[in-house]
Amino acid sequence: MPQQTAVVVLAAGAGTRMRSKTPKVLHSLAGRSMLAHALHAANEIDPTHLITVVGHDREQVGAAVAAVAGELGREIVPALQEQQLGTGHAVQCALRALPADFAGDLLVTSADVPLLDGHTLGALLDEHRSYQERSAVTVLTFVPDDPNGYGRIVRDADGQVVEIVEHADATPEQAAITEVNSGVYAFDATVLRAMIGRLSTANAQHELYLTDVLRLAREAGHPVHGARLLDAAKVTGVNDRVQLSIATRTMNRYILERHMRAGVTIIDPASTWVDAGVRIGRDAVLRPGVQLLGSTVIGEDAEIGPDSTLTDVRVGDGAKVVRTHGEGATIGPNASVGPFAYLRPGTILGEAGKLGAFVETKNADIGAHSKVPHLTYVGDATIGEHSNIGASSVFVNYDGVKKHHTVVGSHVRTGSDTMFVAPVTVGDGAYTAAGTVLRRNVPPGALAVSGGPQKNIENWVQRHRPGTAAATAAAQALAADEKSSQATEQKDGEQ
């Protein structure tokens, strides 16, 4: 029977240094809250039990835990820490949420360490289980640029971990140690249960330190171990907005490197941002200034950018998207979008379709090979295949109270400046003349022309706008025309 594993994510702290109405662990980077990153990482090692300790802002944090549980399709048990009496007390609360007979390994991590990934947790668990057949306690350690504030890892002459001394309790000699505690641990659950009840608040913080379990286990003759992590960034905590900004940039670097190693070309990583939940196909190209956010999916051989932001957008294989802002849209294979297009939620562009310069769409289903080349708004509409919408056309979908739908068939050609006053239907193969205002349905194959013959009211400007620059220009032009006409008549008379 496989050995059981539990993961405890500590998320009960107040996080006052963030100076925010939002709980610290719910601040986001790369499209997920710090808490969500921690839970996703824990889930990657497929634990038997996943527990989150909540305290401050328990309603908000608890709701976030439930949301992540839904995303992952698994149970995440919240454990309430009524009073924040230290990390040892938090784990005591978590143990109550575990089955009484659980005797596997228990990992402890924190929700404010968002860069810690499942691979690192898995490696820690493997080392914990292999050290002297099975360690009682394994602590993940690292060497930061500035160890101030971290608990120091005290080792003996043989390099074995003796204890962890919190910064506030460290002697000058101990404070000089550069190897520190990451706050990430692996425990033998049976040993942990035996030792955690012996914790004391006799320290500078008057709290129950989880770190003391390591010392107590060693004194009881159990093997303890320190596993050093070379990439310190992965276990760097986030306590304020400056650290959040640093962590955000570091996580983006990790994400971009992962995609590049998987076959994605990223021209300028310094100007490219990709959320953790984004998927990108092989041989796709991201040009400078690209942001891929939310659950965006980019197909193989697609080209995105420059200067494009896509949120929850699906882009098909081979599509090209240039200087575009898109939200909740679907772009078909080999389609072309941009520059300066705005795709709003509900937009579907079919295979090899085109949305060109200064086109805005919303709740629009545009068929394969159809084109909306430029300067057009398409809202609440269905357009068939192989149709072309002329420049400066508007789908007039709102009557001031509710919105209405327009249907344009396949192989339709509309002239520039066509107004589709919904609800209206244009049949397959129909045409519209430039400047047409469609208020009635157009039969298949018909040419729609609206308005009467053009009427010119001569000298209107001079009569109604006398003294203006327009009136002066008109008078001069008319005089020049009259002079030219007289000269022509004189020349004809001489002949």
Curated annotation (Swiss-Prot):
It catalyses: alpha-D-glucosamine 1-phosphate + acetyl-CoA = N-acetyl-alpha-D-glucosamine 1-phosphate + CoA + H(+); N-acetyl-alpha-D-glucosamine 1-phosphate + UTP + H(+) = UDP-N-acetyl-alpha-D-glucosamine + diphosphate. This is Bifunctional protein GlmU. It comes from Nocardia farcinica (strain IFM 10152). Residues 263-495 are annotated as: N-acetyltransferase. It holds the Pfam family NTP_transferase. Keywords: Acyltransferase, Cell shape, Cell wall biogenesis/degradation, Cytoplasm, Magnesium, Metal-binding, Multifunctional enzyme, Nucleotidyltransferase, Peptidoglycan synthesis, Repeat, Transferase. Its EC number is 2.7.7.23, 2.3.1.157. Acetyl-CoA binds at residues 391, 397-398, 416, 434. One of its GO terms (molecular function) is magnesium ion binding. Residues 242-262 are annotated as: Linker.
